[in-house]
Amino acid sequence: MNVQQSKFRLSRWAGATLALGLLLSGLGAWGLALVNEQQARMALEREAELLAEAVTRRVELYQYGLRGVRGALLTAGEARIDRELFRRYSLTRDIDREFPGARGFGFIRRVAAADEAGFLRQARADGQPEFRIQQLTPHDGERYVIQYIEPVARNGQALGLDIASEANRREAARAALETGQVRLTGPITLVQASGLRQQSFLILMPIYRSGITPPPGPQRELEGFGWSYAPLLTGEVLAGLPIDNAAIHLELSDVTGDGAAVPFFVNGAAAPAQRLFGHILRREIYGRHWQMAFSALPLFVQRLHQPSPRILFLAGSLVSLLLAAL
């Protein structure tokens, strides 16, 4: 074998070694990228489950406030409830600490259309001389009137609102009365937070004269005289929960029924291009179906401190070059 042939064979060997090394390095980097993505997706899924549970628990917390209001009203008696009693009861609760996110707690009374004049006389004599019934849409049916709510300072605009004058609120109230269970409205715009469209809810608990929930049927309609309720603004409800806006993008939508999804909350302002991958969960919360769409942002992946496919490829390429040069 002459020198030229030997050099040619060595050159071919070096080229083959380099090519094989680069191929293996590329395959290794590609495989690592797949593993990293799978692990990152699993991490997002775990985080999404935790956050969905936190959101659900936060909303479920408000039922205890509703029970407290209901108990105070039943103790006083349907005909003896007055503004001062309701105010004094509210002073026994630290709403912002006990029920973070609730704007307050109130009482909604059923008022037959024929009894409206008498109800207004009683309400005005009860320390509210300017009390009047407000309707979002005129109607001739039974009124469901917000008679009391505390603290008044941040909810005064809601006093006198007939929630039966708007379909979303009315349907939730009817569902609560008929099922005997707590119910949420779909996304609404609170009259006391009108600048935030479809970002709020009412949570309602039915109150029956007997103090217990009657068996299913007409007895519930006969005994139900109102609801304890709380207005909820989504941003305030979620405040304080461990949702890192810089790492996770969250979109909440109401997907109850057959209609289109109604988005009611988005955290942050991450552009679609920043959302690397996502995970969607659905939860039933007091008669509503919520969709929770979580997306991982670059910071979420960075915090996982995963090995870099790029560094693996560069290291493999360097080793391949060294081997080829031997």
Model-derived regions: residue spans:
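Short low-complexity stretches enriched in small and charged residues
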Residues: 4-6, 18-28, 58-63, 138-141, ...
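Juxtamembrane extracytoplasmic/periplasmic/luminal helical "stalk" adjacent to the first N-terminal
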Residues: 10, 21-86, 92-102
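Membrane-interface helix-start motif
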Residues: 297-316
